[in-house]
UniProtKB/Swiss-Prot annotation:
Signal peptide: none annotated. Substrate binds at S141. InterPro entries: NAD(P)-bd_dom_sf, Sc_DH/Rdtase_CS, SDR_fam. This is 2,5-dichloro-2,5-cyclohexadiene-1,4-diol dehydrogenase. Disruption phenotype: Cells lacking this gene lose the ability to grow on gamma-HCH; growth is restored when a plasmid containing the linC gene is introduced. The active site is at Y154 (proton acceptor). It comes from Sphingobium indicum (strain DSM 16413 / CCM 7287 / MTCC 6362 / UT26 / NBRC 101211 / UT26S). NAD(+) binds at residues 9-34. The gene is linC. Pathway: Xenobiotic degradation; gamma-hexachlorocyclohexane degradation. One of its GO terms (biological process) is response to toxic substance.
Amino acid sequence: MSDLSGKTIIVTGGGSGIGRATVELLVASGANVAVADINDEAGEAVVAASGGKAAYFRCDIAQEEDVKALVAQTLAAFGGLDGAFNNAAIPQAGLPLAEVSLERFRQSMDINVTGTFLCMKYQILAMIERGTKGSIVNTASAAGVVGVPMHGEYVGAKHAVVGLTRVAAADYGKHGIRVNALVPGAVRTPMLQRAMDNDAGLEPYLNSIHPIGRFSEPHEQAQAAVWLLSDAASFVTGSCLAADGGFTAI
């Protein structure tokens, strides 16, 4: 387990799935965690289970004032900011590109791209102001590395996240700030579990498209994210860590 004792980390989308698993592992690794979500009940439940090492802040990452407030509240609560896991996103699938409405496309870009940009912007500014050599991890996707049919707006958004990650790594390496992307394949999140409950063929299909023969559990993504956030990855920046069971290898 990585040692993050005394470090302060923001986790967006921290109320469920990969975000929740990452909060739990960060707390177990000694970190203080600012849990951000738009689901107050879920976020507060994660904090209640943290043993006093986490605080919940409501944040819609597509809203600049919310993101600025999240960073300010984190600094006020914990006295610094050492890292961030920008994980909040909305997955969308099921339509060929020409059938995607402009409204749906913009929603994907607003949350998945603009939200990630805003989070990085204000996290980086806070780190530079305090001279902190921090680490930022953005959740991309296998869909941010390859084309996936029927996922047009999501593929476009996650490719943009990968690009923003690489640019930020190049821009801010001189400040000692590392920026990397986590690239999951399919993950057993609550949303995916609901979809599988309604479609008996979905789980066997997802297993079949990952060379490892199954898809990921949230804690496996959390382990990868926490490693990137830790000093164990001190020379890793601008990278896309594929924790995807081989999905992007074929």
